[in-house]
Amino acid sequence: MKHILLLLLSFFVPVVWGQQVEQFKLWPDKPEAGEAEIFVYHPAKGGKAAPAVLICPGGGYRGLAMNHEGHDMAKWYASNGFVAVVLKYRMPEGVHTIPLSDAEKAMSVIRGNAAKWNLDANKVGVIGSSAGGHLAASLSTLAADANRPDFAILYYPVISFDNMTTHGGSK
């Protein structure tokens, strides 16, 4: 049993260790927005320009599930040929446009680095889970055209803040 487990692990370790991760502040010239940042996971294989995804973790707009809805997802997408970008967005704290402005800025940074990161600027999507799904849907419908994603994947998104349809943790 131990040999089988070690054999299986030997297939997954190079995938995780082979990924390059870069970290960037979204608003380096604005100290008050200092916590907004992105983590960029590059696919192991080079070659033609890759599609990209901006990943918006959930957390009820009170915090962020950065590991299982962010970094773990990014590792999987990067291992499957995507440039995967995890967004650590700011909490709204009464100003509901703050997370959306961070997501729009992230899309601008991704497309602006298309050549450097070897990604296809016409194949940039957004992924969101829970409250991050709400943010991804908002980005897909409300963002300026230049910052609008080409596709969206919503995992158990919050689609309404109506008392009858939204769980209490997302209000």
Report each predicted region and the residues it spans.
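Short beta-strand element of the alpha/beta-hydrolase
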Residues: 49-59
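Bacterial Sec-dependent N-terminal signal peptides
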Residues: 1-21
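Glycine/Thr-rich phosphate-binding loops of Rossmann-like dinucleotide-binding domains
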Residues: 62-64, 162-163
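Primarily recognizes the serine-hydrolase "nucleophile elbow" in alpha/beta-hydrolase
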Residues: 105-170
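N-terminal cap/lid segment of alpha/beta-hydrolase-fold proteins
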Residues: 18-51, 96, 100, 166-167
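A fold-wide structural signal in alpha/beta-hydrolase
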Residues: 52, 78-85, 125, 151
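Catalytic nucleophile-loop/oxyanion-hole region of alpha/beta-hydrolase
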Residues: 65-72, 85-121
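Active-site loop/turn elements of alpha/beta-hydrolase fold enzymes
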Residues: 58, 82, 89-91, 157
